[in-house]
Amino acid sequence: MVLQKLGDAQRILVFGDSTIENKLPVIRALWEASESHPLLKAFLQQAVEIIQEETQKLASHEGSLFLHCIDVLEVAEVYAEADEPDELIASVLALVARFGALVLDLERDDSNKRSVGPVSILGFCTGLLAGAVAACAEDMIKVFDLACEVLAISFRLVVALVRRSKAIEPNAGLWATTFIRISKEELEMQLDDYNLHHGLSQDKKAYIGVSSQSWNSVFAPPSVILHIARQCPILSQISQVPTTAAMAVHASHLSRPDVNWILGSLPGLETPVLPDRLIVSTSTGKPFLAKTLRELIQSIIADISMNILDIDGTIHGICSGLDMTKPVVISAMGPSPNIPALTRRLASGGVQLKTFAVIAGDRPRRVVPRRPSSSGYSS
């Protein structure tokens, strides 16, 4: 029901990031749905061809799993049994799921072959890339075409970010941990002290990449994250949980990725952003001012690779563009842990709400405090 006319209801499309769920359940659900939805089936087939074509351009150790599987379902099944995180595989599977959900949702209703609106689009981290397709595609065929092109762009972006991270520290492992029950300001002071005390270089320092009122995600190389979580006398005492990110993102202090290489020369990049679509930057909370898909993705690459993700500011920004006197329909393109915060914000303004899960998957993992270690505080 993403673009279906529902009376005067306003629509919000929500695209989560790549860290929020086990990839297998949502890929399996899409695979099963494709048996009765030929356009989705065609997209999933095309997706694996695009992924394999891009993988063949890489070094032999990069994404090799993609070349040994016949379809995205097999990739998801094999990766579900993996011992170590692989951000390239995880992110690409999540992107296929987001794009696939968009294709499926429009295919379910033939009346969606024309542009309707307005539509507000909320994407978190790599979810913004699927949101860009929704911002520029006016019908099912355009969604299909742009989803295929932007999937290739997204693949190259993830490759660039993984390479940037491995150049800092090649070891496998998680690049993030999430702290709760501590303010951003206090956590920043603790991290500044930690970075200074341990003499960490600019590229290895711990930093806040994702922030909200109730929790903050800290990124750093795996060895630093492990030390922070288990051995640091002060930081290890603060309630935190591991976060399944295996590369550095939202990092203003790191080198900018090669945008020209990431974008390539695909024809769909000149597609205009539709006037009845509003997609919000996760760093400023304001609508992107891009006129074309190319300009939009350039801004999105900056938000993903360089700019801090402000959860509360983004939700405030999307709500500021709504008429709070009219009902709102939220279409969730897969699970997202940020949907409850969005619904609370809207409900507090007295808005009538309905939320649709476009595709089923694992419920987003809740942030549960880990027991502090028994070691005491020290300076």
Swiss-Prot record:
UniProt-listed InterPro entries: Ac_transferase_dom_sf, SAT
Q: Name one GO cellular component term.
A: membrane
Q: How does it sit in the membrane?
A: Multi-pass membrane protein
GO MF annotations for this entry?
transferase activity
Where does it reside? Membrane
Record keyword Zinc present: no
Is the keyword Lyase in the record? no
Pathway named in the protein's UniProt entry = Mycotoxin biosynthesis
What highest taxon heads this organism's lineage?
Eukaryota
Pfam families named among the record's database cross-references? SAT
Question: What residue ranges are annotated as transmembrane?
Answer: 87-107, 116-136, 141-161
Keyword field? Membrane, Transmembrane, Transmembrane helix, Virulence
Q: What does this protein do?
A: Part of the gene cluster that mediates the biosynthesis of the selective antifungal agent ascochitine, an o-quinone methide that plays a possible protective role against other microbial competitors in nature and is considered to be important for pathogenicity of legume-associated Didymella species. The pathway probably begins with the synthesis of a keto-aldehyde intermediate by the ascochitine non-reducing polyketide synthase pksAC from successive condensations of 4 malonyl-CoA units, presumably with a simple acetyl-CoA starter unit.
Tell me the protein's name: Ascochitine biosynthesis cluster protein 8
